[in-house]
């Protein structure tokens, strides 16, 4: 590492003898990585700073060259993401379920509404569902319990919103059991849920709820349990300043427009508005999984 760092600060020595500017950059990167891993004596710090400057200049030159080469081409999302990954502007996010991984599934953060024929009929019921939501909230201000709760049967979850009603839930199906009191007073919700291919797994699913996020609340980045499902949000109350990031992509909720995403990919959500956000949240089978599987 020291030998590379002793090169001409401009990179000229390495440029001439080790493969040009790109070669120089690789040597400087190697020296910087070695210094970061094992440390470097104080007298080398000025040279390491100059090496960092050289690498930064080289990276900007490469980016300018690349962007000039592809300028004028159609703006294709996958090309844009690939370019951002290459330039270090974006991180690579893959499925990392915390409990169960099913192999061979596409690495997709979001799915589009148009891919599912049941989505449009459910979206058409948004008005009736919002009316039920408003009625419940007016009648029972404390109807929503904290989404993340401490259980005497499990270790306390490591979540800053544990037992905090700023992220609230009102369940219609929980752990595979219908919550009759809520289902009975919200027939539009139950009719809408009947349209979707919701998993039926004893003790686990169906799972469906109104998910409430109060103003100023941030759900920290995390991964879901499984990659065999998609999480669906039917947005009901959607103030400005609210968004959902899944992997490298961030989308906003729009009332009556479904969001479908793979929650085994790192995701987070926030409400930076002064009003409450509410979605109807449920899960469906991944469409790539065969019935036999």
Which stretches of residues belong to each language-model region?
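Fe(II)/2-oxoglutarate oxygenase catalytic core
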Residues: 25, 29-209, 213-226, 239-242, ...
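A short hydrophobic beta-strand segment most commonly corresponding to one strand
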Residues: 229-235, 260, 275-290
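A short beta-strand-loop-beta hairpin characteristic of the jelly-roll/cupin
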Residues: 236-255
């Amino acid at each position: 590492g020291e030998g590379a760092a002793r090169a001409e600060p401009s990179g000229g020595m390495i440029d001439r003898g080790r493969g040009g500017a790109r070669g120089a950059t690789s040597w400087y990167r190697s020296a910087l990585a070695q210094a970061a891993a094992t440390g470097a004596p104080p007298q080398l710090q000025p040279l390491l700073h100059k090496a960092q400057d050289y690498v930064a200049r080289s990276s900007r030159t490469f980016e300018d060259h690349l962007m000039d080469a592809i300028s004028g081409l159609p703006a294709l999302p996958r090309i844009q993401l690939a370019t951002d990954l290459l330039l270090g502007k974006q991180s690579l996010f893959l499925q990392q379920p915390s409990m169960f991984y099913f192999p061979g599934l596409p690495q997709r953060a979001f799915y589009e509404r148009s891919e599912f024929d049941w989505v449009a009929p459910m979206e058409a019921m948004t008005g009736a569902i919002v009316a039920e939501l408003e009625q419940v909230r007016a009648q029972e201000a404390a109807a929503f319990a904290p989404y993340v709760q401490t259980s005497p049967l499990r270790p306390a979850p490591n979540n800053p919103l544990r037992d905090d009603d700023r992220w609230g839930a009102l369940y219609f199906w929980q752990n595979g059991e219908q919550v009759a009191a809520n289902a009975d007073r919200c027939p539009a919700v139950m009719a809408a849920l009947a349209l979707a291919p919701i998993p039926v797994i004893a003790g686990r699913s169906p799972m469906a709820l109104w998910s409430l996020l109060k103003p100023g609340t941030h759900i920290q980045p995390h991964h879901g349990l499984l990659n065999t499902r998609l999480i669906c949000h039917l947005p009901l109350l959607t103030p400005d300043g609210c968004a959902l990031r899944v992997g490298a992509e961030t989308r906003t909720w729009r009332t009556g427009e479904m969001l479908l995403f793979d929650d085994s990919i790192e995701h987070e959500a926030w409400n930076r508005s002064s009003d409450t956000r509410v979605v109807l949240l449920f899960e469906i089978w991944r469409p790539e999984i065969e019935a036999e599987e």
